[in-house]
């Protein structure tokens, strides 16, 4: 009986693939499971022509390695579930 129980536990762990699936935000309220091998979440921000009125452009996603920031970008990476939430933007004052 103990052998059967142990076998069921092992099969469950293998089938669930525990610890291998990271969840990252892909948009403001859009968490998704990352593809296998992509074990980092990233947040990339930069200014475009509308930065003064709309704020920075934000890109969220999964990556195997942290993206290298270009000179005009800010990039942060993390490795826990939902660790890259959409940045909160201050509201403009009228």
UniProtKB/Swiss-Prot annotation:
Query: Which region is the signal sequence?
Result: 1-21
Disulphide bridges: 24-41, 34-62, 47-51, 66-77, 78-83
Keywords assigned by UniProt, alphabetized: Acetylcholine receptor inhibiting toxin, Disulfide bond, Ion channel impairing toxin, Neurotoxin, Postsynaptic neurotoxin, Secreted, Signal, Toxin
Key word tRNA processing present in the record?
no
A GO-annotated cellular component: extracellular region
Q: Which family does it belong to?
A: Belongs to the three-finger toxin family. Long-chain subfamily. Type II alpha-neurotoxin sub-subfamily.
Write the protein's name.
Answer: Alpha-elapitoxin-Nss2a
What organism does the UniProt record list as the source?
A: Notechis scutatus scutatus
